[in-house]
Amino acid sequence: MSHRLKDGLSLCSAVALGMAISTGYPAGIVAAVGMPIACLTPASRKLAFRNTISYYLAGLWPMVSGAGHFTGSVPIAILFWAGTATLLSAPWALAWTPKRGLHCLWRVILAGIAGIAPPLGLIGFISPMTGAGYLFPGTGWAGLAATALLPGIILALPDSRSRICVRLALPAMVALAVGSHSLAPPEPRPPANWIAVSTHFGDVSRPSQEFAAAQSIQQTVAASSARVLIFPEAMVPRWSNATREFWRQTLAHCRARGQILAIGAGLPRNTVGTTAAAEVDLVKQYDFAAAIRALQVDDHESPPPANPGPDPNASINADPFENTLLIQGAESSTFYQRVPVPIGMWQPFSKRGVPLRLNSPGVIRMDGQRAAVLICYEQVLTYPIVASMLQSPTVLVGISNMYWFADTPIPRYQESALRAWAKLFHIPYLVAENS
């Protein structure tokens, strides 16, 4: 086979793998485990970079429409898409070598680690490591190691000096995969009396929509006999003393019944001089009747107020905030998002937005369980889940607010990835998504 034909086939393979994983289906995630093979087989480093960036551009195409909604700018979304693909391709291009053999193995491993560990891990999308749970279910860290080693071992096949080692390693991995599928017990069920409630509220950032969502959630909590109820990300855009007052009756009801409400909420990092008493006054000043009318009348048909005056929530909404899973009711604690969306939420050169919390705990104790929580963006990365698994969780919880990505495969990829990690470590998982 000529080098030109071989390089062409490897390019087609890289693009096909990227397109497969972009669908978000488990089969595509498994296929992407072969990405290092397609990207490192060309005859030069330049061609290896070409293959790798082609994989990422094909795999990350849903980001363009999704990030366009998030940032409000399609050009910025395209720039982020192309920049992300370029940065993630760099370690694989550096890992390329014209030689084959076991010395190629450590290059593949280092390139894989570079793509999932910070700083690149902060944008470490569509990692080939995600497929470990579908290839080696229930094997935990051994399965993760096998997934990292597998492409390098296959790349070492052409080297005659490596074949004895490869002949031993490759059948061992096949046996591990077959054994894990045939011997693995059924997927574990979530803890008793735990439920995750997915919603269809859309954008809840406006007061009328937030009010409608809050009413629906409160009614769900009141009617449920579950011990733990988990709701999606950002269902309370800003949790403060004012909103706590509005939720007071529901939280008292939860405490009386021994229920735990886990809800996505934004916590202001400062109140810009707004005291707790002043925040409670904001609730008393809030016109809930007007909010209800806004739900019934199309905004475009509603005449603007003659003198709207200052927005009583402006001082809160303008503040930097924490994106959290707030635990209230029979227990009280807060889980902080560790890796928010770069630029859109985490703004390293601004005092606004959500801070990066790489050293924050990845597990929170809730109802006697150790819950590893992944908040939206963290579900498409590898670093947050690996960091959480080091803390021995007993259940995996994913919350997200995906109404702006509803027309993309991203929500499907999130759940497929979450399920893959749950299968790998054989723990139950729950998903609460707002669309």
Residue ranges of each PLM-predicted region?
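Membrane-embedded alpha-helical bundles of multi-pass enzymes
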Residues: M1-S182, W421, P428, E433-N434
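Short, conserved active-site loops that position catalytic residues or coordinate cofactors/metal ions
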Residues: A27-P36, Y55-G59, S198, S225-W239, ...
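Flexible, charged surface loops at secondary-structure boundaries
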Residues: A43, G72, P188-R189, V221-S225, ...
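A short, flexible N-terminal coil/short beta segment enriched in small residues
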Residues: S160-P186, A318, L326, S332-G344
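Membrane-interface segments at or immediately adjacent to transmembrane helices
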Residues: M173-I260, R269-T275, F288-A294
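Solvent-exposed soluble domains appended to multi-pass membrane proteins
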Residues: V236, N241-T243, T250-R255, R269-S435
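Metal-dependent active-site segment of extracytoplasmic phospho-/sulfohydrolases and closely related
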Residues: I260-A262, L430
